[in-house]
């Protein structure tokens, strides 16, 4: 306390000098600043002026004055120990109070300059005096806001780790009573800001402080367009505060030309505009530009992103995603309609890692998810779809999917395709032997009974010709429930298997469906070689020697499948052995 009090007294003397100079913002700013450069301090003074104009806009809203001494106090922390936090926290409530007092831009500018003087390295007393002179309507509030903001700043300078309220109170009993008001005024963001800034030296707790301050500000400012303007202007201020309060040491390293660019950009708005002229739109483009410039400073840039900036911030602010918390927390109630409509994109960004699927994102995620789900789920059905590709129903419905998938999954299906091709050959031989339906049904049922493409190649190779009768008979026993499968097989060629088959089969591909023909055409070059060593002598013969004349004849038979009538499972079972033999004969011959 004592350690902070002596520097505070020195700062008070500086404040007196700076107060007189505060009305000449240029000299007071550079002198009081002792910042990186006179130009930087001049920019800060301009930013303070812009903030004053913003506060004047808020004064049009007619809320309390307390906010006002804050901009100065915000920037008043050259060492930035807790400056930005205090600035942000106090800036908004004090802007409210200033609105209540209805300060004129002129008075606001003077008070701001007083704040500049104080910022210039002096505490709030000169600002207190200037505020008393200019803001007579509510000197207590100005004092209280200054007492809340100004003294803690010297405290932050002298002993940043010290609880700043007490340090400021001890050197300045005259303003100590004002701390009660700022506590009430600041609605807990003030004290929390002080404690957080004093403890964390203003670096980490700032987002939380911003949230508290913005929540309180949002509560007070929700109804008023000036509230929005304050939000945007205070949010640009937040960057300014970061640079101004932190300007010297700037724990965040935010004392960068970016911040000053921000200030110079904000300044034109403040100077150009009378109190009401500073429209949210004007400041928002500014905030957008500043937000982009301020990306290195996530909280300030995200806070700078105003409701209107946020839609753009969403499109462009996907850059802001790294700043989820601030963008989410900064979304004030007014901003939330916009932020909800567009900001649902923002909110998933805060939650993005956990619950990116926001209401709006969900349609996209659902549409994309539907894309994913068809990809995912049909990949599961890939086995049945590929198995039943010979069926027209599933073949027609799944053919497009399975085609795309078969391209990707063609490698596991190659075996299944060749197995299918053999079975098609079987079917065609059976159809040549008056039993097209029975064996086709058996084949399909066998394919369906087989668990998946991976097992299918194995089954086709291991039991390619010899297990077929048994399997076909078993599947044929199941055929009555599988009659739908037979129906699918009964009319495959037009819908299910759109036979570009001659090309593909002449290429050596033996896929029953166009999709499988595509996937197998991918592998057509290797397929004869890969499948040649299959256990049955017929597969290599059929794949290497047989395909062209064999499939020419059998494709016509496949086309005849539509007209062919389904067979009884008993016939199918009977048909299986000799048809297999005939198939082997034909494939070999």
From Swiss-Prot:
Region: Necessary and sufficient for inhibition of PRC2/EED-EZH1 and PRC2/EED-EZH2 complex activity, residue numbers: 484-503
Modified residues (Phosphoserine): 306
The keyword Nucleus is annotated on this UniProt entry: yes
Signal peptide: none
Amino acid composition bias (Basic and acidic residues), ranges on this chain: 426-437, 575-589
Disruption phenotype: No overt developmental defects with mutant adults appearing indistinguishable from wild-type. Two-fold increase in H3K27me2 and H3K27me3 levels in germ cells in testis but males display normal testis-to-body weight ratio and normal fertility. Increased H3K27me3 levels in postnatal oocytes and slight increase in the number of oocytes with lagging chromosomes. No significant differences in the number of primordial, primary and secondary/antral follicles of pre-pubertal females but older females show a reduced number of follicles at 16 weeks.
Keyword terms: Cytoplasm, Nucleus, Phosphoprotein
Biased composition (Gly residues): 29-38, 105-114
UniProt biased composition (Polar residues): 193-204
Stretch list, region Sufficient for interaction with EZH2: 482-490
Region (Disordered): 1-46, 61-548, 561-589
PANTHER family: EZH INHIBITORY PROTEIN, EZH INHIBITORY PROTEIN-RELATED
Its job: Inhibits PRC2/EED-EZH1 and PRC2/EED-EZH2 complex function by inhibiting EZH1/EZH2 methyltransferase activity, thereby causing down-regulation of histone H3 trimethylation at 'Lys-27' (H3K27me3). Probably inhibits methyltransferase activity by limiting the stimulatory effect of cofactors such as AEBP2 and JARID2. Inhibits H3K27me3 deposition during spermatogenesis and oogenesis.
Subunit structure: Interacts with PRC2/EED-EZH1 complex member EZH1 and with PRC2/EED-EZH2 complex member EZH2; the interaction blocks EZH1/EZH2 methyltransferase activity. Interacts (via C-terminus) with SUZ12 which is a member of the PRC2/EED-EZH1 and PRC2/EED-EZH2 complexes.
Name the UniProt record assigns to this protein: EZH inhibitory protein
Organism: Mus musculus
Gene: Ezhip
